[in-house]
């Protein structure tokens, strides 16, 4: 099989879906690896490292699409790539089909075989862990008074209480956010619909966090005392309900922060 690694062209995307380590494995398994020049540069992997791993460097994405049986990159396809798709060719990339119906149609029209990278991680994508931790830090930055927040210190100070944080969703994203906020001294409540997850987290943190079943009623009861909410729920596609609706936002105090890490279309 000919494996093709594309350089991501979406504005602001610096990741690569395959490092030289993965290329070494692919080549050692007897496959041919084509890598577009600069595919890993912004992620810290030089073209020379891919060559040393056994890859052949090519200049354009057109060459990758024309020669490769398996084509991969991080982010969804751009319109300029639609005409390059071939019947029977395997595409592995983020697609986010609910948000990009025109891209789904282009894939169907081409006859290629496409896998949604965002849904392929059995134990949760490393990106989920990174998003949870980074989301927690961005929330704390937004809490600064210079950014319009309450100006609270996350762990509190002598005579001043710690920040109260509500995490919606106890999966990979929520657990990553929890690890950061708990370590910094926030008073955290985690909500989920899975009682098993809540029990596990309660034991993991030696009963030093609060857990509740995730319902609109429970959320509404906590919002008036909550300084920051992190949405880590993967919302069902096509769902027309919300965990937090517009009237519920009025329950939160001025300067409170919401970090929508999941950021699904018509999300929670």
Where are these regions (language model features)?
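Short, well-ordered alpha-helix to beta-strand connector turns
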Residues: 30, 54, 67-68, 88-89, ...
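Rossmann-like adenosine-cofactor binding region
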Residues: 207-268
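An N-terminal-biased, well-structured beta-alpha scaffold segment characteristic
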Residues: 2-106
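Short, ordered loop/turn segments at secondary-structure junctions
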Residues: 8-10, 38-40, 76, 96-97, ...
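Short acidic-hydrophobic, aromatic-tinged amphipathic segments that line or gate anion-handling sites
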Residues: 56-61, 115, 210-215
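Glycine/serine-rich phosphate-binding loop and adjoining beta1-alpha1 elements at the start
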Residues: 2, 8-10, 79-163
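Glycine-rich phosphate/diphosphate-binding loop of Rossmann-like nucleotide-binding domains
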Residues: 7, 11-42, 148-231
């Amino acid at each position: 099989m000919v494996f093709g690694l594309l350089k991501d062209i979406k504005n602001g995307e610096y990741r690569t879906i395959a490092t030289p380590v993965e290329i070494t494995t692919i080549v050692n398994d007897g496959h041919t690896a084509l890598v577009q020049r600069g595919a890993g540069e912004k992620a810290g992997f030089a073209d020379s490292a891919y060559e040393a791993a056994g890859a052949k460097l090519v200049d354009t994405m057109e060459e990758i699409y024309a020669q490769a049986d398996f084509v991969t990159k991080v982010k969804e396809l751009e319109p300029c790539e639609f005409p390059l798709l071939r019947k029977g060719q395997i595409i592995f990339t983020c697609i986010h089909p609910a948000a990009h119906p025109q891209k789904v149609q282009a894939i169907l029209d081409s006859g290629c075989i496409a896998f949604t990278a965002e849904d392929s991680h059995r134990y949760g994508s490393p990106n989920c862990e990174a998003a949870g931790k980074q989301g927690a830090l961005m929330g704390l930055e937004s809490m600064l008074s210079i950014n319009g927040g309450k100006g609270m210190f996350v762990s509190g100070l002598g005579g001043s209480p710690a920040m109260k944080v509500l995490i919606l969703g106890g999966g990979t994203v929520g657990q990553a956010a929890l690890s950061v906020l708990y370590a910094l001294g926030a008073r955290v409540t985690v909500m989920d619909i899975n009682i098993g997850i809540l029990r596990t987290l309660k034991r993991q943190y030696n009963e030093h966090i609060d857990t509740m079943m995730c319902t609109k009623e429970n959320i509404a009861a906590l919002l008036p005392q909550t300084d920051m909410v992190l949405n880590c729920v993967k919302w069902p596609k096509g769902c027309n309900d919300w965990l937090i609706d517009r009237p519920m936002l009025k329950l939160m105090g001025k300067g409170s922060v919401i970090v929508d890490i999941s950021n699904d279309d018509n999300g929670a």
